[in-house]
Amino acid sequence: MWLGVVTLFPEMFRAVTDFGVTGRAVNKGLLELQTWNPRDFTHDKHKTVDDRPYGGGPGMLMMVQPLRDAIHAAKAAAGDSAKVIYLSPQGRKLTQQGVEELAKSDSLILVCGRYEGVDERIIQTEVDEEWSIGDYVLSGGELPAMTLIDSVSRLVPGVLGKQASAEQDSFSDGLLDCPHYTRPETLDGLDVPAVLLSGNHEHIRRWRLQQSLGRTLLRRPELLENLALTDEQTKLLAQFVDSTNECG
């Protein structure tokens, strides 16, 4: 997968290219990331990239010409098929379903805003989609872009050691993930659930599914509203509710 990023702070993306899962993906050639800095497209000695907004008000906007030229350079490198995404709190909220949609693309260009944002006409003429990682304000689009890159890259074939790792992640099937345990068997008086030590793979599968359903019900019940549960899931969830009521 090819990813282009338009950003005033390309150094921040070393966190993506040099570390962790995404860093290994880059080293394996499964993920390619290039950056374009609007400062490199300025025409004055001060490399100015901000400008005053029409109508006044606090703050500045990203200057149109350097930003637009940087986007055009990224498009030229990516080819016609690349989708241009602007990271914005006004965009569609990023969910696992959205991540799966974006992961089907061969190439993406991510535009990271700064200051008070960008000229609306840039969005109208250069951007295909706006995406948000949540209802809160950040200083720029770089952290949302890195979040999107990390989540999308996990679905690129070969990036994770086992595809099952991605399939078991929270939200991959619309549910939160189940609890996980490793050694020791007892920690501060808390034991690993016996079923996980049983070696019975079917029992373990059902326990994990039930825990996933129950955790979703307790912590993010709205997620269940959008799911058509199977007969097995409905039964397991009912059993979870019954056991929770008995305990408490």
UniProtKB/Swiss-Prot annotation:
Sequence positions that bind S-adenosyl-L-methionine: 113, 133-138
Enzyme Commission code(s) on record: 2.1.1.228
MF-aspect GO terms: tRNA (guanine(37)-N1)-methyltransferase activity
Keywords linked to the UniProt accession: Cytoplasm, Methyltransferase, S-adenosyl-L-methionine, Transferase, tRNA processing
One record GO biological process: tRNA N1-guanine methylation
CDD domains assigned: TrmD-like (cd18080)
UniProt-annotated location(s): Cytoplasm
One GO CC term on file: cytosol
Recorded catalytic activity of this chain's protein: guanosine(37) in tRNA + S-adenosyl-L-methionine = N(1)-methylguanosine(37) in tRNA + S-adenosyl-L-homocysteine + H(+)
UniProt record similarity statement: Belongs to the RNA methyltransferase TrmD family.
Function: Specifically methylates guanosine-37 in various tRNAs.
The protein's assembly and partners: Homodimer.
Name of the molecule in the record: tRNA (guanine-N(1)-)-methyltransferase
UniProt organism field: Shewanella woodyi (strain ATCC 51908 / MS32)
